[in-house]
Amino acid sequence: ELWLSKVQAGNLYVNRAITGAIVQRQPFGGWKKSTVGSGTKAGGPSYLIALSDWEPAQATATATTQSVTVRETLATIENSELGKRDDFAFIKRGVSSDAHAWDTEFGFGHDPSKLGVERNILRYVPTQVLVRADESASAAETLRVVLAGLAANAPVALSVGKDLPVDVRGVLENKGIKYEVKSDAQFREYLASNAKTPVRALAGTPLEGTRIRYIGNDEKSIYSALGGRPDVAVYFAPVTEAGRIEMLPFLREQAVSITAHRFGNPNRFSERVISSR
């Protein structure tokens, strides 16, 4: 149980060989330097999402979020000047879609094969993301992405080109979000200064999770500032209301394969350690 909660790897194996990954049963893809860019696990349910382009459309989910953090943040936004704008409905629909995505996909481990003698669980582990909203980004887009991160229970660092209202900024900081205001030029300088910084040395910084969710219209400058380093993933697609898409940057996929028998006799010890559906 301790090992499963601490180990940092994309594929974990307990009491079995580490070779023989199979589509759906054991989606494959590593963490850290075992992966490049913003891809997802091969053979997993999100594989095609990372290979596709997505355009915003109105979400239809009506689920209610169970996250107190999200509810309190949304209430503060609604009571601020942003709540009086037409695009607040965009934020609310996004929150409902996040809740639906959490209830149906991200909030628990999946074992679709259900072999019985072997458990193959795909689960989602929250990871820190640096959300960058450049000077062209709207407040609604920024908050929609941040709320997706909060719904995923992920640590979020937020860098904005334009400051948000004081009360909204206050609730974000109260929820543990690392908040800063940087011009586009200042942000590029920050990235350039860390273009060659080893990943371990990024611990404790906004780039600790080696993931950037970029909201803006100049993603090329972000890649250039990073010097093309492959171990920092940049998500730059248009902001959507779909929780199934917007929550992905804040979650790392982890496949856990556990032998559930001993000499042919079923052994259910792992069910006390890791649950699945």
Model regions and ranges:
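C-terminal segments
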Residues: E1-Q128, R132-R144, A151-R277
